Each structure stands twice: as structure tokens, then as C-alpha cells.
């Protein structure tokens, strides 16, 4: 592997001159600069990122800590963040923790050692212990995104109440009166607010919520599958079902299909999130759209602003608003 000394020798200059060319820290004559760049290319020389960061005080890298990269919703946000980082000239180090405090601590220490310029932390829920841990790394510019009503973080307001209302309202407008729901864990903010939107739409339409048709999952496809199988053991079934995310809808559709039932002929289903794959479900899923692209872009823009102004004291917490939109496809039928 070539070193800076090899480059200097080939170009016929000092290592200091090579450093100035690489870091653009001092004027270098054009012919000298060209000789150095030619030597770098011929030797396939790559400067030490750590050594360079010590000189210019930046690694042009960002760390991201996220609950999981497996869930399609989070995977699409990560993709958006990575794309926007790349356009801004930054590399992204992404790690997952699955709500394990020890892993979070280890990841934070590792990213700090890599001298990342900033940190983006995106989890579905935070404990006070995890917030205290993050505060111990406060010297690193950081954006901590929270879907909950936390006063000590930046906030993602995805207007889940409005989205839950919008989904249920669409089912009602299609003539459905017997409506069930597979929600997330109701002790979690996102799940609870989507359910409250469902309640509001049902109340406005003067429709009764059947407690037997309210099932809790954990936003995974197997939860949709298991909840639908429990629902199908009942004597009376809803004509429509609101699944509070798209992957639970996928699991629910799979369970229905295994029993020889069809969507939407035997039961209409609406999802939530509008993940990329939802348009390729059988049938294509009617759902509630949330802009993952906009969320990722705004989160990084806030972080880059904090990196730029990191020496100016405490930054105000920010808020990102994501407006839900109804996407009509083929999984809901009108029974008017």
C-alpha cells in the first residue's frame, strides 16, 4: 500500500507539499499540484481518513443509529438518508440496536472513535436511560428523532391520528360498517394515535367498535398473519380491516389467502406507510402514504446545520411534519 512518502518521492516534492495538495490548506503551484495528483493516481494512494480528519477537523462522515434496518419503513428512511448524505459529500455509517442499551452504548463509542461529524438517532420510542446515554455524547452534533411527545428530543410528527382517521373514513365512505383493526402495541405512541384516529372516524359515523375485532400486533408481518388467523376463528367477521402498517397487512392477506378467502371480495384491507412493496401486493394495497424521502432529507439537513454551527452553543429542538395521504389501489371494494 502506497504512503504519502511514496507520493512525495514520485512527484519530486516534500510530504508537506503533498499534504497541502490533498487538504487544500495552502496555495501550491499548478504544475506541482498536477505532479502530485498524477503520482496519487498512479500509486492509487488513499490518504488516512483519521490523519486527515485531525488536520481539517472533519471526516465528512455521519453516524446513524436506528432501531432496525429490516423493517421496510425504516429501510426506506435509511436509503433516503444515505442518498442525501452522498449528495452533500458525506459517507454514512449505519448501525442498528433493537432497543438493546448495551449495543447503543457500544455503537456510540465506536462512532465517536471514528470521529463522525454528526449523529442521527432514529428510534420508535426512547427510555429515559437511553436519552441520558445520548446526552453523555453531547459534544457530537446530534439529531435525535422521536415519534413520541418527548420534550427533550427533536420530534417527528407524522400526524398518525389524522392518518388513522383518514384510513377508517375511506372504509366507511366505501360503505363498510363492520370494521376491524390490527393495531400496534397500544402503549406505544404511534400505535395509540392511529387507533385514536380510527375511534374518531367510527364515532363520527355512529358505528360501534366490536372489541373482538380490535387486535394488537408489533408492526411485523407475522403479527398481521397471527392476528388475522385469530380473527378468522370468530363466527362473525368484519367486512373491512384497517392494518396499522403495510407489513401487517401483508401478513393478514397471507392468512386470508391460506383459508381460501380473497381480498377485497371477502374482506377489504387498508394499510399504512405506503412502503415501496405495497403497490406489488396481490392485490395492490390501498394505504396511507408517508414521505420517507422527505423525512430523511429534512433530518439530515437539520444535522448538517448543527454541524456547521456546532461552536455556537445549544441548538433548538426541531420538528418535522409528515402529512399522511390516502393512496387508493385495489384492496378495498365499495359495498354501497
Curated annotation (Swiss-Prot):
Gene3D superfamilies: 3.40.50.2300, lambda repressor-like DNA-binding domains
PROSITE patterns: HTH_LACI_1, HTH_LACI_2
GO molecular function, one term: transcription cis-regulatory region binding
Alphabetical list of SUPFAM superfamilies matching this protein: lambda repressor-like DNA-binding domains, Periplasmic binding protein-like I
Pathway given in the UniProt record: Purine metabolism; purine nucleotide biosynthesis [regulation]
DNA-binding region (UniProt annotation): 4-23, 48-56
Highest taxon in the source lineage: Bacteria
Record keywords: DNA-binding, Purine biosynthesis, Repressor, Transcription, Transcription regulation
GO terms for biological process, alphabetical: negative regulation of DNA-templated transcription; purine nucleotide biosynthetic process; regulation of DNA-templated transcription
Domain HTH lacI-type stretches: 2-56
InterPro entries with a match to the protein in the record: HTH_LacI, LacI/GalR-like_sensor, Lambda_DNA-bd_dom_sf, Peripla_BP_I, Tscrpt_reg_HTH_PurR
Positions bound to hypoxanthine: 73, 188, 190, 219, 273
Cited HAMAP family: HTH_type_PurR
Domain note: Consists of two structural and functional domains: an N-terminal DNA-binding domain, approximately the first 60 residues, and a larger C-terminal domain, approximately 280 residues, which imparts the function of corepressor binding and oligomerization.
NCBIfam families per UniProt: PRK10703.1 (NF007979)
Quaternary structure note: Homodimer.
Functional summary from the UniProt entry: Is the main repressor of the genes involved in the de novo synthesis of purine nucleotides, regulating purB, purC, purEK, purF, purHD, purL, purMN and guaBA expression. PurR is allosterically activated to bind its cognate DNA by binding the purine corepressors, hypoxanthine or guanine, thereby effecting transcription repression.
PANTHER family from the UniProt entry: HTH-TYPE TRANSCRIPTIONAL REPRESSOR PURR-RELATED, LACI-RELATED TRANSCRIPTIONAL REPRESSOR
Protein name listed in UniProt: HTH-type transcriptional repressor PurR
Organism (species): Haemophilus influenzae (strain ATCC 51907 / DSM 11121 / KW20 / Rd)
Gene (name only): purR
Amino acid at each position: 500500500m502506497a504512503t504519502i512518502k511514496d507520493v512525495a518521492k514520485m512527484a519530486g516534492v516534500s510530504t508537506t507539499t503533498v499534504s497541502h495538495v490533498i487538504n487544500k490548506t495552502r496555495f501550491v503551484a499548478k504544475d506541482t499540484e498536477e505532479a502530485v495528483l498524477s503520482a496519487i493516481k498512479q500509486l492509487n494512494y488513499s490518504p488516512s481518513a483519521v490523519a486527515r480528519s485531525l488536520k481539517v477537523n472533519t471526516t465528512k462522515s455521519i453516524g446513524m443509529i436506528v432501531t432496525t434496518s429490516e423493517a421496510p419503513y425504516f429501510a426506506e428512511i435509511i436509503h433516503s438518508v444515505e442518498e442525501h448524505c452522498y449528495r452533500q459529500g458525506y459517507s454514512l455509517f449505519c448501525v442498528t440496536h433493537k432497543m438493546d442499551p448495551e449495543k447503543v452504548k457500544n455503537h456510540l463509542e465506536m462512532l465517536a472513535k471514528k470521529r463522525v461529524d454528526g449523529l442521527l438517532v432514529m428510534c420508535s420510542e426512547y427510555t429515559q436511560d437511553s436519552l441520558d446515554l445520548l446526552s453523555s455524547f453531547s459534544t457530537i452534533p446530534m439529531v435525535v428523532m422521536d415519534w413520541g411527545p418527548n420534550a427533550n428530543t427533536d420530534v417527528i410528527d407524522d400526524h398518525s391520528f389524522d392518518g388513522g382517521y383518514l384510513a377508517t373514513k375511506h372504509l366507511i365512505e366505501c360503505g363498510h360498517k363492520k370494521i376491524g383493526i390490527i393495531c400496534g402495541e397500544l402503549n406505544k405512541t404511534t400505535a395509540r394515535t392511529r387507533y385514536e384516529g380510527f375511534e374518531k372516524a367510527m364515532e363520527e359515523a355512529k358505528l360501534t367498535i366490536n372489541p373482538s375485532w380490535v387486535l394488537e400486533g408489533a408492526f411485523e408481518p407475522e403479527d398481521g398473519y397471527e392476528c388475522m388467523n385469530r380473527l378468522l376463528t370468530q363466527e362473525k367477521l368484519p367486512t373491512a380491516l384497517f392494518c396499522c402498517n403495510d407489513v401487517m397487512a401483508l401478513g393478514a392477506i397471507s392468512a386470508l389467502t391460506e383459508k381460501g378467502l380473497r381480498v377485497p371480495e371477502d374482506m377489504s384491507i387498508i394499510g399504512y406507510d405506503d412502503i415501496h412493496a405495497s403497490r406489488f401486493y396481490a392485490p395492490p394495497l390501498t394505504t396511507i402514504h408517508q414521505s420517507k424521502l422527505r423525512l430523511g432529507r429534512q433530518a439530515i439537513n437539520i444535522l448538517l446545520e448543527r454541524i456547521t454551527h456546532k461552536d455556537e452553543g445549544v441548538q433548538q429542538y426541531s420538528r418535522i411534519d409528515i402529512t399522511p395521504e390516502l393512496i387508493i389501489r385495489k384492496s378495498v371494494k365499495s359495498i354501497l
